[in-house]
Amino acid sequence: PIAGSMVLAAILLKLGGYGIIRIMQTLPTTKTDLFIPFITLALWGATLANLTCLQQTDLKSLIAYSSISHMGLVVAAITIQTPWGLSGAMALMIAHGFTSSALFCLANTTYERTHTRVLILTRGLHNILPMATTWWLLTNLMNIATPPTLNFTSELLIMSSLFNWCPTTIILLGLSMLITASYSLHMFLSTQAGPTLLNNQTEPTHSREHLLMALHLIPLMLISMKPELII
């Protein structure tokens, strides 16, 4: 069920990050060198999850692996125990909660009309669902972390804190963000561009679907304008 995927991506996945924040508060901040293996694993895991996204042909699997890669950045940022890292991790959890839930919602909108989640079979949706294409574009731009969204602010805070802690981390961080941009654009172009393969009649998008997307993206945009509410 799509509701389960949306709640899982938006709330349950972030509870792990919240748990790590609570545990880290009980540990001494001077011992961050002890956590180097965990930070390395988190960044390497984020990069591997992003590489897995590039191999996916299933739309829902791609979005799920995308959530895993973002949580790798969150874990790395929390583990170094700096104010910037903690603020960036909290902001990214909130921003990606909205974004990944919106992506799952859009994937279901596509699935209800095409009855498939294979990327190559869902192409050309721009021709039959033009309004949904706008939502796809906005959500993918937020997933890539383009300014001035909260995703950009949070990833910038995480990159700054990790780079200040150890400049070498910029290699895995930069690679991870480059791959994120690649698979997000690939997902958008695979589903929207090209000729449509659908021969049957397709119903247009409903008002409830537009309302659902607006309830995801408008709060995220409003928080992006005033990030000090959560940072």
UniProtKB/Swiss-Prot annotation:
One of its GO terms (molecular function) is ubiquinone binding. It comes from the Eukaryota. GO terms for cellular component: mitochondrial membrane. This is NADH-ubiquinone oxidoreductase chain 4. It holds the Pfam family Proton_antipo_M. It is an enzyme of class 7 (translocase). It comes from Azemiops feae (Fea's viper). Its main location: mitochondrion. It catalyses: a ubiquinone + NADH + 5 H(+)(in) = a ubiquinol + NAD(+) + 4 H(+)(out). InterPro entries: NADH_UbQ_OxRdtase, ND/Mrp_TM. Disulfide bonds: none annotated. Keywords: Electron transport, Membrane, Mitochondrion, NAD, Respiratory chain, Translocase, Transmembrane, Transmembrane helix, Transport, Ubiquinone. Its EC number is 7.1.1.2. The chain crosses the membrane at residues 1-21, 34-54, 61-80, 84-106, 118-138, 156-178. Belongs to the complex I subunit 4 family. It is a multi-pass membrane protein. GO terms for biological process: ATP synthesis coupled electron transport; electron transport coupled proton transport. Core subunit of the mitochondrial membrane respiratory chain NADH dehydrogenase (Complex I) that is believed to belong to the minimal assembly required for catalysis. Complex I functions in the transfer of electrons from NADH to the respiratory chain. The immediate electron acceptor for the enzyme is believed to be ubiquinone. It is found in: Mitochondrion membrane.
